[in-house]
Amino acid sequence: MTKAYLEASEVERLERVAANLRDRLLVRLLFRLGCRISEALGLKVEDIDLTRSTITIQHLKSRLKLSCIECKQRLGRSHTFCPKCGSKVEKAQAEQQERRRQRVLPVDNDTLGMLKEYIERGGPVSREGKLFIFGINRHRGWQIVHACAEKAGLPKLVNPETGRVHNVSPHRLRDCFAVMAVQRDDSTDGIRMLQEWLGHANIGTTMRYRKVAGQELKDWYERLWPRKEGDNG
């Protein structure tokens, strides 16, 4: 049966069939952090804080647009004065907006232990003077997830918005994390927290995870009219 989202147990199967520690770690981070493939592949050893049990995610989907706090004019990183209203661009203002491109996320002990083992084994790859956790490109990341899905015997998924059927991809692990989070806490505060965790600029993007193949509406209706004992319909 074709469905829209993976279950957490299915993602765990992906991890179990991974070919090596690197591939298992990639699957683990994509799911446990709910990060984008570009963010996972951009991780460096310096982003891992073993003492505080955190990972700093660099938001790579799009560069944050700096803007004037007075007139909202778009600013370049080198601007010291707004080209539209002439207001001075304080360094602290630019740095504050720049920090919004990062998310510092807590990590569970099991995942942290896996990261530590991977680093101690010499897994990270040096590029341009920096140690990247994975050192692979986006295409290879997709290949790893797809190969794990085939090996685990997972079905293809259907896009709930377009109806198109597609293979299991890295982003589907992010989807799984988000759906699981909403199922456990769909309060206003919970959705806001998820928005911040996922790095969504628009909360509308986060809200779509509440619409899981119509199940939410069905559950709501059944709470209004609960089935009586013995009903077969």
Give the predicted meaning of each segment.
Residues M1-E12, Q58-K61:
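Flexible interdomain linker/hinge and immediately adjacent N-terminus
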Residues T2-Y5, Q73-A92, L224-G233:
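C-terminal secondary-structure termini that scaffold catalytic or DNA-interacting sites
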Residues A8, R16, G42, L50, ...:
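Phosphate-coordinating loops and pocket residues in cytosolic domains that bind phosphorylated ligands
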Residues A8-L33, I37, S126, D185:
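Basic, Lys/Arg- and aromatic-enriched nucleic-acid-binding interface segment
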Residues R16, G123-E128, Q143-E196:
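Short, basic (Lys/Arg/His-rich) helix/loop patches that form interaction surfaces
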Residues L30-R52:
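Short, charged phosphate-coordinating catalytic segments
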Residues R63-R77, F81-G86, Q93-E117, R127-E150:
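C-terminal catalytic core of Y-nucleophile DNA break-rejoin enzymes
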